[in-house]
Amino acid sequence: MATANSSVKIGNVTFSNSAPFALIAGPCQMETREHAFDMAGRLKEMTDKLGIDLVYKSSFDKANRTSLKAERGIGLEKAMEVFADLKKEFGFPVLTDIHTEEQCAAVAPVVDVLQIPAFLCRQTDLLIAAAKTGRVVNVKKGQFLAPWDMKNVLSKITESGNPNVLATERGVSFGYNTLVSDMRSLPIMAGLGSPVVFDATHSVQQPGGHGGSSGGQREFVETLARAAVAVGVAGLFIETHQDPDNAPSDGPNMVPVDKMPALLEKLMAFDRIAKGL
């Protein structure tokens, strides 16, 4: 059976369960070119000062919004142009999620990490298509999935010839409109061989909690992120925005960007202790 790489390198960014955590961060969706550059510049500046490896994330299409009327993003073609320019300007790798097999080939020339949404983590054809691009694949563990069941998910990618895969914990369904984070899932998934990422913002999401959109409890992002880092992870996934309360999607669980530096400093301290760095 093909195995995953325990250390995944993306440009100058390294994901390893025994190394300092890398950060995947950015707004939920790509709103405009100007907004993307503003957010990217802020994140690049703070992570450079703190010495944290950054992968910038944003979604060109939020295809699984609660309501048909909800905003979804600027679309694939425009987003690829922006991602290419962001990489030239700031030099970091970029990540976006894909929802169909056709999108894999379309984004791979520009995007460094293809992300499989949690709802789609068992879609075999999508996993194979993402794997065959040769890009790093980040798989969100489904809210309905046990951590040990990620073994089969990851093997669909590695057995398609791609050992560079990340496994991301983003909470598990706990009754209606609620998620809970079981920190046991982090070492369990690490035992499967891949670097493990903890999604601190979607883990506090309340799916469909606002009727026509999802709610969230951003006040618990730091609590869960500290717990995850204390257990030990290769990376943290944190969505952020300059004005979360007025963001077009996932505002209730995004971290205000001006609060990110203090949060990251605390998490770095926990990371050093947990890993003996």
UniProtKB/Swiss-Prot annotation:
Transmembrane regions: none
Name of the protein in question: 2-dehydro-3-deoxyphosphooctonate aldolase
SUPFAM superfamilies for the chain: Aldolase
Catalytic activity, EC: 2.5.1.55
Gene3D superfamilies in alphabetical order: Aldolase class I
Gene Ontology cellular-component terms listed: cytoplasm
Catalytic activity: D-arabinose 5-phosphate + phosphoenolpyruvate + H2O = 3-deoxy-alpha-D-manno-2-octulosonate-8-phosphate + phosphate
GO biological process: keto-3-deoxy-D-manno-octulosonic acid biosynthetic process
Organism lineage string: Bacteria, Pseudomonadati, Pseudomonadota, Alphaproteobacteria, Hyphomicrobiales
Organism: Brucella anthropi (strain ATCC 49188 / DSM 6882 / CCUG 24695 / JCM 21032 / LMG 3331 / NBRC 15819 / NCTC 12168 / Alc 37) (Ochrobactrum anthropi)
Keyword Cytoplasm (UniProt): yes
Class of the enzyme per the UniProt entry, highest EC level: transferase
Family: Belongs to the KdsA family.
Pathway assignment: Carbohydrate biosynthesis; 3-deoxy-D-manno-octulosonate biosynthesis; 3-deoxy-D-manno-octulosonate from D-ribulose 5-phosphate: step 2/3; Bacterial outer membrane biogenesis; lipopolysaccharide biosynthesis
Compartments (UniProt record): Cytoplasm
Domain of life: Bacteria
InterPro entries in the record: Aldolase_TIM (IPR013785), DAHP1/KDSA (IPR006218), KDO8P_synthase (IPR006269)
Signal among keywords: no
GO MF terms held by the record: 3-deoxy-8-phosphooctulonate synthase activity
Keywords, alphabetical: Cytoplasm, Lipopolysaccharide biosynthesis, Transferase
